[in-house]
A protein has these predicted regions:
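Phosphate/pyrophosphate- and phosphate-bearing ligand-binding catalytic cores of soluble enzymes
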Residues: 4-5, 11-17, 56, 158-313, ...
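Phosphate/pyrophosphate-binding loops and the adjoining catalytic core of nucleotide-dependent enzymes
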Residues: 321
């Protein structure tokens, strides 16, 4: 367990904004957690759990508390039968490493297990996946999530929680709502995957990719490679550009609202989803810069920090985008990344 003081949040998050955290503790083993929480309790300081920092925005006032940076690692097979396999990954592993591991396993008939291949190249850690119920290209983690192991800081003990206890929804779980916020440190995640390949029709852009190439076999590796190529063509490389990935949530409409939207020429996808990127782009904002934040010219739902020096700059840019979409379409966009610290 490593401990540091006065660490800029900007160094811990991919948007590269935010003041200093009073303490940062790196959690390298499960047994570190009791000591780390005891330290915070003795200091009477709040805690915050951070993985790769790709879905968190640091605020200018910093965090007068203790940030736990997740450094737990390890991926392994728990059990399997002829049709499926259960994989466990420690929460500090990259989600993409788990996906890569799953598509390279021999399943008895061919290479790879299916269930999370469309989540390829999503930035962030395994532990963050159930918090936000991450999803992309037609898959969500809740579709394959079996269970999680957590440290409950309220009860000061480790617990095993099944997926159906987590209230998983669109970017929603018990971990980011109500009393569950900050209560649990996820130490590992178990997914249950199957050997049967995905079948068309796929998510719109993924199906178009396969149609253009005449793809007929949809092995987990083929789907992973396709998603990786699509994401690379649309999304900024987090190693090169400061961003937090998808910045705005999609809009979800009921049946009546969906019909009204379609009558106005607004695309509505399965489940009543209106893509926020389409709204932003068609409001004329793609590639535009506000207060040092640029709307990506590849995918309009992404904000890139070109020269912003403060959370205040980001907040003004965010509001400019929200106002423009609201004025043109009447929908109010919501931010997807969480925020850390005081304004």
């Amino acid at each position: 367990m490593k401990k540091r003081e006065n660490v800029p949040i900007s160094e811990l998050t991919t948007m590269r904004l935010g003041g200093a955290a009073r303490y940062v503790i790196e959690i390298e083993e499960d047994k570190d957690l009791a000591e780390a929480y005891h330290f915070a309790a003795e200091k009477k300081l709040p805690t915050y759990i951070l993985g790769g920092g790709s879905n968190v925005i640091g605020r200018d006032g910093g965090f007068d508390g203790v940030i736990f940076v997740n450094k737990l690692h390890g991926i392994y097979v728990i059990d399997s039968d002829p049709d499926r396999i259960r994989l466990c990954a420690k929460s500090g592993d990259l989600l993409d490493d788990l996906v890569e591991y799953s598509v390279k396993l021999w399943n008895g008939d061919s290479w790879g297990y299916s269930g999370i291949e469309a989540l390829s190249k999503i930035p962030g850690t395994v532990g963050a996946a159930p918090v936000q119920n991450v999803g992309a290209y037609g898959q969500e983690i809740k579709q394959t999530l079996h269970s999680v192991c957590v440290y409950d800081c309220r009860d000061n003990c480790f617990k095993h929680m099944m997926a159906d206890e987590l209230d998983l929804g669109y970017r929603h779980s018990i971990f980011n709502t109500g009393d569950g916020v900050g209560r649990y440190f996820i130490t590992s995640v178990t997914v249950e995957l199957h050997k049967h390949w995905l079948k068309p029709p796929f998510y719109t852009s993924l199906q178009a990719y396969f149609d253009e190439r005449g793809t007929k076999e949809f092995t987990p590796q083929v789907v992973r490679d396709a998603v990786a190529e699509i994401r690379a063509s649309k999304l900024p490389d987090p190693a090169e550009f400061a961003s937090a990935g998808s910045f705005f949530k999609n809009i979800y409409l009921n049946e009546e609202e969906a019909k009204e939207a379609e009558a106005k020429g607004i695309p509505v996808w399965d489940g009543g989803k209106v893509p926020s990127g389409w709204l932003i782009e068609n409001a004329g904002l793609k590639g535009k810069e506000f207060y040092g934040m640029r709307v990506s010219d590849k995918a309009a739902l992404i904000l890139i920090n070109e020269s912003a020096k403060s959370y205040a700059d980001l907040a003004k840019a965010r509001q400019a985008v929200i106002d423009a979409v609201k004025e043109k379409y009447g929908y109010t966009l919501e931010q997807e990344p969480m925020e850390l610290g005081d304004e």
